[in-house]
A protein has these predicted regions:
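A contiguous pocket-lining binding segment that forms or flanks enzyme active sites
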Residues: 132-137
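N-terminal strand-loop-strand beta-hairpin
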Residues: 1-128, 163-193
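Long, well-ordered alpha-helical scaffolding segments within enzyme catalytic domains
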Residues: 151-164
C-alpha cells in the first residue's frame, strides 16, 4: 500500500541560536546532523512553478567530513492545515547526488533556485527541528512533524509561539530585507551553475 507523505511545518526567525540549541538539548533533543545543506530546485520552462510544485535535489556535506549524500524530492502545491504549512512530499535518498544532477539536466531540467546553508538538525519526540544559517540572512528554525509533536517542540525552544509562522523562505527573506535594508542572500553562488 502506498501512503501519501504530508509535510507539516512552521518556521521562526531566531535571534539567539545558542539559547535555542541549549533549550532543546535540555528538553531531550538528539542531534541528528550537523553540516552544510545545499538545495537545488529544478524546473523546465517554469512548468513546475506554474503548478506550485517543486523538484529538489538536497545535498548533505557533513561537518565531520564523512561522505556526502543527497535526497531527491518532489513537493506538491502548498496548502494550509490549521496553523501549519502543508505539502505532499515524496523523497528518496541518493548516494551519488552528482549523477542525479546530470540526469536531471539531460532530462531538460534547469536549476531555478539555489539555497545553501549550514544546519543543525535535531529530533525531539516526533518532531524534527532544524537551525539554519544562511550566507546573508537571519537564522531560521524549522519545525516539522505532526501538530502535537510540532507544538511540543515549539514549547521546548523557549521562543514565543507567535514567532512560528506557516511561511516559506521567500517570506523570511523579504522580512529580513525590509527590516535591515540589506539584500538577503540564501546561496553562496552569485552566478548560475
Amino acid at each position: 500500500m502506498t501512503v501519501v507523505r504530508e509535510e507539516l511545518e512552521l518556521k521562526a526567525r531566531v535571534e539567539n541560536p545558542d539559547a535555542v540549541r541549549k533549550a532543546i538539548l535540555a528538553a531531550g533533543a538528539e542531534l541528528m546532523y550537523r553540516g552544510a545543506m545545499m538545495d537545488r530546485r529544478f524546473d523546465r520552462r517554469g512548468r513546475l512553478e506554474q503548478r506550485d510544485e517543486v523538484v529538489r535535489l538536497r545535498v548533505y556535506h557533513p561537518a565531520d567530513k564523512s561522505p556526502e549524500w543527497g535526497v531527491l524530492g518532489w513537493k506538491g502545491p502548498v496548502q494550509r492545515r490549521g496553523e501549519y504549512r502543508l505539502r505532499e512530499e515524496w523523497e528518496s535518498r541518493v548516494d551519488d547526488p552528482k549523477a542525479v544532477l546530470v540526469i536531471l539536466r539531460h532530462m531538460g531540467y534547469k536549476i531555478s533556485l539555489r539555497v545553501d546553508r549550514a544546519v543543525e538538525q535535531y529530533r525531539l519526540g516526533g518532531a524534527t527541528l532544524r537551525l539554519e544559517w544562511y550566507p546573508a540572512m537571519d537564522v531560521l528554525l524549522e519545525v516539522e512533524g505532526q501538530p502535537e509533536a510540532i507544538e511540543g517542540a515549539v514549547r521546548a525552544t523557549g521562543l514565543p509561539r507567535d514567532a512560528f509562522l506557516a511561511e516559506s523562505l521567500p517570506y523570511f527573506t523579504a522580512a529580513y530585507e525590509e527590516r535591515t535594508g540589506r539584500v538577503a542572500r540564501v546561496s553562496r553562488l552569485k552566478r548560475r551553475e
